Amino acid sequence: MSEHRIATRIAAPENRVEPLLGSTVAGASVASDRVWHWGDDNMLPYALSLISRRSVAHRRILNDKADYIAGKGLVCGDNSPLVSHLIVSANGEGDTLRDIVHRLAFDEALFGNAFLEVVTDAEHSFLALYHHDASKCRVARDSEHIILHHNWSAFNSSDARSLPLFPRFEEQTDGTLRTILHYKDYEPMFQHYGVAGYLAAVDAAAIAYKTDKWNISRLDNAFQLSGVMMLDSVVDSEAEADRIVRMAEEKFAGNPGQVLFVLRDKAEGDNSRFIPINTATDGDWHTLHTQAENDLIIAHSWFRSLSGLDYSSGFSSERILHEYEVALNTVILPEQEQLLSPIRKVIELVLGVDASSLEIVNRPPTRSKPQYMRIWEARKADGLDYDESDPEQQQFLASLGKTSNT
């Protein structure tokens, strides 16, 4: 395969991203002198990652969406041994295809973008798939390559890699042919990167985190009131004032709330006193936290019962199954198709086999099934072996006298 050579030039001083001067492509340089910024300062993925590690409800929704979209594994037809092998071993690192899909689903839920590297050779004798952390990937200015770097806040061109966007392959120094798939959620006015669906609720995620932090602060303060300590004392210097304040702090040692010490000239008598600051708005904080959680669920297009967020009326298996069915048809199945469709194309292009039978096994979070379902249908829904021609599996679940747990 011919090598792709591209010249480089120095980036403008105001560009925070260093010009890309190196590549793993044999004898070639990086496809662009810089990348399209992901966010105003090219650090938006870092900010989104930080929020996801601080907001409890936000993180739970992200985790659950990825779990449901990745399903219980992947299956294919019996006449596809190469695809079956890829399902079990997607790469040389021991990842299954389900592992890869789960990471892609998580990245797309968190960033609105996901990246999948495809590796083969000139003879197409093998296929390996590698997930790449989306926060380490940027679109090159030629819009035909993805630049990978481990730390975009301290870019070093010698550590950068360049991979062409699918369907273009480029030969690497190890003799392999590689390309990369870029998944991105569509958003008007955004061409180079997708936008996470929950972006309108980023402030809500921050509110949920800050209300949790406020509760931690109250716990650290042993729920003691904050306030102002008025001290009557005559001081001749700043040092004397500091000494008196330290003595007061020692006297009120322990783990009190935040106390402001104020020294004033001593009048007749000792009028030193503590003026508490009452937090009579605890209910408002709770309401704010609840509203933030509700906004997050709405922005994620998700459902409370599927992420362990309780209703005021409690949980029920019927509600969980109902919300799962809605989520399956409105969120899970479309996301699965978005992730699997390019993978099927890669399999067909590289291995030359039909991958149309590749699909994800979906299973509801509870075992309850309608009694009009046949046994083979129930086993199929649970990802178990089934035989439509088996007379016993043609029976309805109702004939068993109870809801099947097969």
Model-predicted regions and their roles:
Residues A11, R16, W38-G39, G92-D107, ...:
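C-terminal helix-loop subdomains that flank or include functional centers
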Residues M1-K266, Q291, W376-T406:
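Structured, contiguous alpha/beta core segments that scaffold functional sites
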